[in-house]
Regions:
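Flexible, glycine-rich active-site loops centered on histidine and acidic residues
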Residues: 69-115
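Short, acidic/polar
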Residues: 2-13, 69-76, 154-165, 246-256
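Acidic (Asp/Glu)-rich catalytic clusters
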Residues: 10-17, 45-55, 76-84, 130-136, ...
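Catalytic cores of alpha/beta
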Residues: 67-80, 158-162, 187-190, 210-216, ...
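Glycine-rich, proline-tolerant flexible connector loops at the mouths of alpha/beta enzymes
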Residues: 12-44, 94-105, 171-187, 270-272
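Active-site beta-loop-alpha junctions enriched in small/polar residues
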Residues: 1, 24-28, 63-65, 92-94, ...
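Conserved, mostly hydrophobic/aromatic
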Residues: 21, 79, 166, 170, ...
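Active-site pocket-lining/capping segments in soluble small-molecule metabolic enzymes
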Residues: 104-152, 159, 190, 194-247, ...
Length: 284
């Protein structure tokens, strides 16, 4: 589709005045022979194209996994040059998605990556011994939170301690992984506040659109579907029926969250805006 495909995704959403657009990043992929197989444009190019066409803040994802600290610095320098100063800082999955291994010469954890960004915000780059305010960047950093805990964490309490480390390292707000039970978000926020985390916590909502997602989403994202949602989806005979169930559930989630004065809503569209548009017309 090229850039026009991205524009075609964004254009129908403009009537809802989106406050920001997140842009995912993927590390290089290699086949068994070691040959690079990635066939997609870079995040910097996509972010710049969107920002300059729509004048809407873009939030590129910056990962530890798959990138050295030097590669990260070059990406951050490019983003700074383009005037893109909002980031979502993530550990990522690395090249092997089953077992996380940090890149040789890369940041091990999101907190380490945040410290690298904060160094650049003070004007200190990798080869510098001192800070130079004349070359300082001005990045604002969000981080990920997991209402049902990250799959690698032993417990939610342990995961929240890791989240606190990310906030202490420079995270200014939290965007949550998708969830389908609002009570888990409310409990997560309460635990975060008790742990001393005071930054905004933006809930992430993913509308279900396919029958297969009743099994796929819990497996991939280590989450649980509420019994009522799972039962309704398993009764569906077509993807259209599943999408109707998912749409109504997302509308219910969004309205309840907004009634609790959440700071914003983050929608996972996966480049398909139609379902989110239908939901937004009922919510906003």
């Amino acid at each position: 589709k090229g850039i026009e495909g991205i524009y075609n995704t964004i254009d129908p959403l403009l009537e809802f005045n989106p406050q920001f657009i997140n842009i995912t990043t993927h590390c290089e992929q290699y086949d068994a022979s070691g040959k690079r197989t990635r066939k997609r444009p870079g995040t910097v190019a996509v972010a710049a194209a969107i920002m300059h066409k729509y004048n809407i803040p873009v939030v590129p994802h910056i990962l530890c996994g798959g990138f050295t600290r030097e590669e990260t610095e070059y990406v951050l320098m490019d983003l700074n040059f383009l005037g893109i100063d909002n980031l979502l800082v993530l550990r990522g999955d690395g090249r092997n998605k089953d077992i996380y291994q940090p890149e040789v010469g890369g940041n091990r954890h999101a907190a380490d990556l945040l410290r690298q960004v904060q160094d650049m915000n003070r004007g200190k780059y990798l080869d510098d011994e001192t800070e130079n305010s004349s070359v300082a960047t001005n990045f604002n950093c969000g981080v990920a939170g997991y209402p049902e805990k990250h799959y690698s964490a032993a417990s939610l309490d342990e995961d929240i301690q890791h989240l606190k480390e990310k906030i202490d390292a420079g995270g200014q707000y939290i965007v949550t992984q998708m969830f389908f039970d609002n009570q888990k978000y409310f409990e997560f926020v309460d635990k975060c506040r008790k742990a001393g985390i005071t930054v905004p916590i933006v809930p992430g909502i993913k509308p279900i659109g396919f029958m297969s997602q009743v099994d796929v989403l819990p497996k991939i994202f280590s989450l649980q579907l509420p019994q009522a949602l799972e039962q309704a989806l398993r009764k569906c005979k077509t993807n259209e029926e599943a999408a109707a169930v998912g749409t109504e559930w997302a509308i219910m989630q969004a309205k309840e969250l907004m009634a609790h004065n959440v700071p914003s809503l983050h929608w996972f569209t996966y480049s398909d805006p139609a379902q989110v548009i239908q939901i937004a017309k009922s919510v906003y």
